[in-house]
Amino acid sequence: MPINVPDGLPAAEILTKEDVFIMEEKRAEHQDIRPLSIVILNLMPNKIITETQILRLLGNSPLQVDITLLYPETHRSKNTPEEYLIKYYQTFDSIKDQKFDGMIITGAPIEQMPFEEVDFWPELQKIMDWSKANVFSTLFICWGAQAGLYHFFGVPKYPLPAKMFGVFPHTLNRRDIRLLRGFDDIFYVPHSRHTEVRKEDIVKVPELEILSESEESGVYLVGTKGGRQIFVTGHSEYDPYTLKAEYDRDISYELPINIPQNYYPGDDPRQTPVVRWRGHSNLLFANWLNYYVYQETPYNLEELGNR
């Protein structure tokens, strides 16, 4: 089934060429079904790249999804033109009276800053609080996961001695959780971050459960009981060449950076990267959409406030 996006969105053209079923607003208006309503709070600098990555995964589900793109109004983007944001994105004030089946809060390359020093932190706190009564299930990614764990549960983040950078093996802590249905015993996920959340802090919070982790990259999936909030510390949505682009960028700026682990054959950056996370990423997003959004959300979204 298609994902419904704003008319003219550049990601639509890219994904259509990949044979992902995209439906623009005009055509979607004539569909006599209620699609899932998903709002994506995009905190990444390059909005087009991130929205394309996430829409690609949402479009691989048999469910029809209606997309609303959201950006923090209190932050001035240096990488995405304001005209683009005005044309394709909404502000919180414009959607705060609506209710959504699901929400995705992306990462942001600001994890070395204290949360309180991030210019849009007060707005993000307001949005996260709003999501509790107006969104059925929220998926937090990387820095977004750290922000959510800190805001709701006081879980701190810690600086790493070196950037966690590469594709790492993960295992499951539970096998009877629907979010994890179909996952391999060992699966791979890209990570790209300078900070971490720690297991010893999370296990102190009774509302939280660690669902998956890695000996190398630490905690990966954390969920609240019932799946209303899912925290993902890695980047399963990454394209095959995203880590390469980050590595090449840092090398060009002469920044200290290690070769991403388990990514290039023989750890040789001249080789073509090996993708080992595509199956996991599609399953993670499909399971979240199906089991935690579609199967659980009330048909009448106005009932959300009572749950």
Swiss-Prot record:
E.C. number(s) listed in UniProt: 2.3.1.31
Residues forming the catalytic site: 142 (acyl-thioester intermediate), 235 (proton acceptor), 237
Site for Important for acyl-CoA specificity, residues: 111
SUPFAM superfamilies per UniProt: Class I glutamine amidotransferase-like
Record-linked InterPro entries: Class_I_gatase-like, HST_MetA, MetA_family
Main location: cytoplasm
Annotated Pfam families: HTS
Keyword Cell division listed: no
PANTHER family: HOMOSERINE O-SUCCINYLTRANSFERASE
The protein's name: Homoserine O-acetyltransferase
Organism encoding this protein: Desulfitobacterium hafniense (strain Y51)
